[in-house]
């Protein structure tokens, strides 16, 4: 199952329509104006991203992720909303992994890297349990990029930063990048 920004949009709308019975009550506490502002930002992010066709989806717009409570302790519900595999959600929560670490980098040599690929790409903030996590690859949360795709990812990040300005100090990229060559 590929989990793209459109899926996240639909899930947020469904959570609100269903009255936030099980999760992310913050979505229901927003007034209509605030909710519509957030969703219009996500609409714009979807529109911009679709023009670049990156091999994996970017991180959510920082303003949206802040309002949804990313990094506020509800790792399970946020991870599910974002389409993360359960094994990655557990690893993130139990091991407090906030970045690609030495264990991840050591796994790079174990991957079968297709010819012409120069980087491993993930949405910023997505820290997989392992770079070998098959479910994360299937959901397009981890992918390889060739030079042209890598260039387009950098252009996409520039356009997202320009068109969706924010003041979140920890968000300076929409993609995690492990450069291979």
UniProtKB/Swiss-Prot annotation:
This is Uncharacterized protein MTH_236. To M.jannaschii MJ1106.
């Amino acid at each position: 199952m590929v989990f793209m920004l459109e899926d996240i949009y639909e899930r947020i709308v469904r959570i609100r329509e269903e009255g936030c019975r099980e999760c992310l009550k913050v979505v229901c506490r927003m007034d209509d104006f605030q909710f519509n502002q957030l969703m219009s930002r996500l609409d714009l992010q979807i529109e911009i991203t679709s023009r670049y066709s990156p091999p994996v989806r970017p991180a959510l717009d920082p303003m949206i992720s802040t309002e949804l409570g990313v990094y506020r302790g509800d790792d399970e519900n946020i991870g599910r909303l974002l389409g993360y595999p359960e094994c990655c959600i557990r690893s993130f929560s139990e091991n407090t992994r906030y970045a690609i670490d030495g264990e991840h980098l050591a796994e790079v040599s174990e991957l079968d890297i297709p010819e012409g690929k120069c980087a491993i790409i993930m949405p910023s903030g997505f820290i997989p349990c392992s770079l070998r996590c098959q479910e994360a690859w299937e959901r397009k949360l981890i992918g390889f990029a060739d030079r042209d795709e890598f260039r387009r990812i950098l252009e996409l990040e520039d356009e997202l930063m320009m068109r969706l300005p924010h003041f979140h100090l920890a968000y300076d990229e929409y993609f995690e990048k492990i450069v291979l060559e």
